[in-house]
Amino acid sequence: MKKVLAFVLALVMVLSMAACGNDANKQGDAEKEVTKIRLAHDYSPETANSIGMENFAKLVAEKSGGTIEIDIYSNGELSGRNSQTTFKLLQSGDIDMAIVPPPNTDAWQLFYQPFFFRDSDSAYAACQGEAGQMMLDKLRDSNNVVGLAYLPIAMRAFTNSKHPIQAPADMEGLSFRVLDVPTLVAWMKEFKASAVPMSMAELYMSLQNGTVDGQENPLDTIKNQAFYEVQEYLSITNHIWSFSLFAVNADFWDKLTTEQQDILKECAVEASKDIKELAPEVNDAAYDFLVNEKGMKVNTLTDEQWLEFQKAAKPVWKAMEATIGADVLKPWMDAVGVTWD
């Protein structure tokens, strides 16, 4: 009888310990609950932005101890490679994070001002200061997204089928496809050129059949879209700094813990730095391809020529000042060291 009682007591103890162990395992599982984040972008795998996002996902997993998992939807998988669609998906919360273009709204017209930024480095540096943070704050106010970082792409260049662009007068009478942005349309008018807003999907055919004489984009876009097949002249004008925004849906952001937010912010800044290092390599490779492999006729503006363009563009800045807001334009002029003179 004593042996039976001892056996029963031992069995009870074993079962109790097993139950405690199961409770501990459940508690451990709860502590390691994974937050999944859907991140979308429209860039192909070989681009700096795409590589940067892969590095971002790895860094987040490492710093969160595997408790934050980034699922990447690249190459326009969710948007049909339409950046405006990506932005709308982010605003609505159908995706959690994304690389998106700057909004085509009043204050953000600043970044479409021609010949405002001299180069990528000075533009990126200004974005890391108070002026850059001011714009990220405005992003949430009007778009329901939280801006985490600026992702540099490159300065933009012109192509056309007529002649090199070396002075403002060289643009007179030419028609250029531009983004449907008020500042760009005003600029073309000021330089006596024709602005023809159209989608990227329409552009190649329009260049081929002469609907427009030229277009402007970063060199990597010119390469990837094969515009060299239908354009003879490449002018390195460095007239506008192209960049993207790394952003997160505001409602989703507010549900995260402070620790999770800090991890994502930190990793976003690191991704931005990675992309800044990669972007010049991509740009240089595109230049080599377009000029040395495909034989486009290239000219690069000298400092003197660039300043001539900047002087001619300042009436556009002044015309857009009321739209952008003097409270936005002035801090940015100070940040990049430009004046009205």
Locate each region found by the language model.
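Enrichment for repetitive, rod-forming helical segments
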Residues: 9-10, 268
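N-terminal secretory/targeting leader peptides
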Residues: 21-120, 140-141, 146-341
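C-terminal motif of bacterial Sec signal peptides marking the signal peptidase cleavage site
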Residues: 16-19
